[in-house]
Amino acid sequence: MTESRSGRTVGVPRPVWGAVTATLTATVLLLAAACATPPPPGAAAAATSGEPGPSSSPSTGAPRIVPGTSAPAAPTTAPAPELPGGGRVLFPGRRLVALYGHPGTAALGVLGEQDLPGSIARATKLAASYAPLSDVPVVPTFEIIATTASSEPGGDGDYSSESTVASLRPWVDQAAAAGMYVVLDLQPGRADFLSQARRYTDLLRLPNVGLALDPEWHLDPGQKPLAQIGGVDAADINAVTAWLAGLTATTHLPQKLLVLHQFQLSMIRHEHNLDLSHPEIQLLIHMDGNGTPALKDETWAAVTASTPPGLPLGWKNFYDEDTPMLTPTQTMAHQPAPLMISYQ
């Protein structure tokens, strides 16, 4: 209502705002419907049936790709660990040249005559001296005495002193960083080889670590070190082989070396019964005799004659006990050429 010039009120209709609002709303909805993308075929049916339409996430919980983002990365598989020098099978793709001994104890071998960096440098130089004589790459190696035969029974009465994993870990880790292989040597006394091997499971889970059994220092009940040459039955070796093969397989490691030291035939009883059926394990017979070249050659002939066909062989040179110690050329002249050569 408005007021006229005469002062009288004149009836002029006001706008009907409810009707205007309804009209505008209807117009907006019609425009939105005209611009909308039609749903894909089957979407309406899916909606009425309760099944997920093409734009719904599957019931399996698969990730939904949001526009403007990348698809989830596919899971990647870590590369299989390899041996020092490459590959996952030991021989015939390499030759090992090793320093033998115990860290910090010079009396037990040349490995203990210098500190860790010095031992790496010495092993590397020694391996290099064989490179011109070898038809395969030469890998510097540590053969570390992990358990040492003792003249005293010790707290557990087994006449064997066991190194801790923590004390050996730096030698293993730094050897790996230098591209070296490591063999843990067991001198069990009255203990059994398998029980001692299990002590070093954490180290044997590493791809550059193998194992050596030294029957010379395996004692029967009532025996003491140095009173006789010890020995072990093939069945006891087979128990270690089976356990180590299982560990290697379950942790997807490359083939592991299992060294058997020998300089008398009696050191490995029933040698023909050695279990060679585990592809995860490469056995190697290591001739450990010392003395004159003629005496060592005689021992070599006896050991090689009794070794199961096809097993690789090793040779040990002694700086003090050999008279004289063979040169690399003389060492490699043996047939078959040794695939592991240790220095003590």
Describe the predicted segments one by one.
Residues 192-204, 268-274:
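Distinct, well-ordered alpha-helical segments
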Residues 30-54:
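C-terminal region of N-terminal signal peptides and the immediate post-cleavage residues
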Residues 99-172:
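N-terminal carbohydrate-binding/catalytic regions of secreted carbohydrate-active enzymes
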Residues 50-53, 58-117:
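N-terminal module-boundary/linker segments of secreted carbohydrate-active enzymes
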